[in-house]
């Protein structure tokens, strides 16, 4: 059983957290007590911790993520936790050579004894592409090409020819060898058709939308799986939450999420579950309370209702 099987089950919903696990204004988080919060999240029953790939701080974008390189920081958090899944949300494939991505992935998958889930994306910050001498207009092709290369590297002494990243002639092999299955998820559309995502990935990560839009999105996802002769694959989404102190507090929208009490939060998550969402990545950036308090309340009032 892969980590994806543990966090995403058909007809059920689980919860994860994305770093930074804190509320912060502006682009740059303080990144304080993250190790303690990660360990507490594991103890409370969150199923995954998510790490972002943000090479540069673009002030116009407004969020620099967890600041540290995702592979380095994942290794750090791995050493402060025991079993919780560690997921990238998401590695920007066009900006990294697939060999380097695979080397980091295989190394950490082995060292963590199979705790890694690989979320992949084409990137949503155009300002980063010139710094890597990448053509933004080719990002869809770059993503697809890198994805194929990365899959090829899972084979022994692989043979593969890439249009952008080089070729493999079967004479060299990438170590360490991987003993654990690594789920590969696509974030957003990454410039690909939904049928391509359904056929080639192990699941789809998308963004929070209103329930009418979500219903159509889920219908499109199931249709894409059917059209490509695929069995069920999980649907994962992010969600910004400002959990207010009063459990009965009325909800109000915030960017890509809501603020409200635990009563509304539970009802909202249950509705997501009924629509077929399998895992929700909670982001606390816009919170009004200390993350420690929010984690404890989520652990007491929300987590017992989900897998």
Q: What is the predicted role of each segment?
A:
Residues 45, 53, 77, 108, ...:
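Conserved, mostly hydrophobic/aromatic
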Residues 28-41, 104, 186-196, 260-272:
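Short, acidic/polar
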Residues 1-11, 132, 137-178, 207-307:
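An alpha-helical appendage that flanks or caps ligand/catalytic pockets
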Residues 15-19, 49-51, 86-88, 116-120, ...:
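Hydrophobic faces of well-ordered beta-strands that scaffold small-molecule active sites
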Residues 19-31, 91-99, 180-189, 250-263:
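Active-site mouth loops of central-metabolism enzymes
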Residues 1-80, 182, 285-288, 297, ...:
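N-terminal beta1-alpha1-beta2 module of alpha/beta enzyme domains
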Residues 10, 14-29, 94-160, 212, ...:
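Flexible, glycine-rich active-site loops centered on histidine and acidic residues
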Residues 5-9, 42-43, 74-82, 105, ...:
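Acidic (Asp/Glu)-rich catalytic clusters
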């Amino acid at each position: 059983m892969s980590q994806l099987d543990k966090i995403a089950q058909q007809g059920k919903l689980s919860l994860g957290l994305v770093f930074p696990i804190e509320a912060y204004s502006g682009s740059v988080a303080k990144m304080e007590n993250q190790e303690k919060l990660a360990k507490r999240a594991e103890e409370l029953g969150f199923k995954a911790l998510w790490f972002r790939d943000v090479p540069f701080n673009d002030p116009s974008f407004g969020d620099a993520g967890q600041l540290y390189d995702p592979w380095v920081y994942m290794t750090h958090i791995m050493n402060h936790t025991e079993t919780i899944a560690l997921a990238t949300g998401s590695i920007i494939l066009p900006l990294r050579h697939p060999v380097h991505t695979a080397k980091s992935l295989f190394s950490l998958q082995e060292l963590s004894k199979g705790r890694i889930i690989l979320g992949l994306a084409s990137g949503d910050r155009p300002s980063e592409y010139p710094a890597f001498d990448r053509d933004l207009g080719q990002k869809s092709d770059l993503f697809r090409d890198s994805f194929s290369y990365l899959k090829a590297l899972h084979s022994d002494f692989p043979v593969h020819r890439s249009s952008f990243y080089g070729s493999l002639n079967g004479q060299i092999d990438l170590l360490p060898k991987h003993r654990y299955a690594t789920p590969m998820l696509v974030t957003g559309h990454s410039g690909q058709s939904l049928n391509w995502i359904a056929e080639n990935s192990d699941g789809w990560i998308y963004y929070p939308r209103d329930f009418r839009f979500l219903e159509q999105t889920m219908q499109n996802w199931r249709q894409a799986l059917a059209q490509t002769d695929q069995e069920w694959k999980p649907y994962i989404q992010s969600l910004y939450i400002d959990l207010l102190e009063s459990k009965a507090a009325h909800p109000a929208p915030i960017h890509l999420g809501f603020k409200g009490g635990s009563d509304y939060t539970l009802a909202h998550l249950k509705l997501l579950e009924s629509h077929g969402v399998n895992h929700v990545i909670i982001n606390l950036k816009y919170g009004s309370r200390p993350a420690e308090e929010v984690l404890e309340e989520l652990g007491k009032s929300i987590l017992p209702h989900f897998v």
